[in-house]
């Protein structure tokens, strides 16, 4: 009963309100529940843009303007929104009284849901272990893992689902290395990551909600035991180092048990699904543009910029939100304290004022790196360098190994709104080129 009431407060009633709003043409309602927007959001980007830089909806504001999005993300007049904070008051009351004690990536004490001074403390602690040297070592791991995974493909030629067999397998190895997950537990962590992905959405169906809760609770229970194991037998993984710093450091780096669990959970949710989506989106885009693959074979130095363009054109994270800390004027509009602005990152990344011919995939686009796929300001993604490395190495290695790979069907998109990617992507591999391990 408690789960049902929580679903009604967080999702069920919102689904009903959104269905009515869609018939009335409300843009926010369409963003939440319109199947056409989930299938192909690009026309919706342009429709919202036609209404101006800042669009008023029934419940909040919405922007697709790159400059405004950039400024809002960096503004001290706005803060991050905790999951469910912008629900109508009666639903917010019910949601708070029926939620469980499991952690959520968009609720305190997650890095995504706190502001200074806690945010500064968390970020300083994580940065102490997530160094450029650590990222460099993980890049080597990505390359070797990619080669190992593709070796298995070469042994079983034919049609394969590249998302299930490659795009999801590569980041789970990296995440497991960060969290110190033993090999026998990695399939469970993969399952937790896949189940938790829709947890960022509002208005999800009841059955999907149950699967999400199963994933979050399962991960929470597993993580409690895993952290205890790392305390008793620490390894050379980043999570063991983080535990040591967090529990023996000064007041600026100390973390309690709940905060440690929140960071580990964020690594899973933010580091897994987004990278799966980056790889899947990139493979699909490059399969659809063989002329770009030909250019990359002649000019492999273009791979880093190609990844930036993939991030810009098909952003793994579609949107975020900020709430006004005080009454403030934005784009000529007076926003009251407590009002929310939904920032449509994916649409801002196609703003024609910043990116000429914004819907075109151009691997040589000179300003591709100006995208907001990793946000900006104090909440800029801590794992951006690693995500870029996984994208570049994962895509380059895949297409180098299978130069004749072709799409073998339409594939299917993930049923999520905040995150965007492929759930299946069948390909015909073709002959494999031999590769030498680094």
Swiss-Prot record:
- Listed GO molecular functions? cholest-4-en-3-one 26-monooxygenase activity; heme binding; iron ion binding; steroid hydroxylase activity
Could you list this entry's UniProt keywords, alphabetically sorted. Heme, Iron, Metal-binding, Monooxygenase, Oxidoreductase
**Positions in coiled-coil regions:** none
**Keyword Heme, does the record have it?**
yes
| Essential cofactor(s) | heme
- Provide the E.C. number(s) assigned to this enzyme: 1.14.-.-
The family database entries (InterPro entries) matched by this protein are listed as: Cyt_P450, Cyt_P450_B, Cyt_P450_CS, Cyt_P450_sf
GO annotation, biological process:
cholesterol catabolic process
Q: Which CDD domains does the annotation name?
A: CYP164-like
Top-level taxonomic group: Bacteria
Which residues does the record give as heme binding sites? 381
- Give the family, as the similarity comment puts it: Belongs to the cytochrome P450 family.
Designated name of the protein: Putative cytochrome P450 140
- Species assigned in the record: Mycobacterium bovis (strain ATCC BAA-935 / AF2122/97)
Task: Supply the gene name.
Answer: cyp140
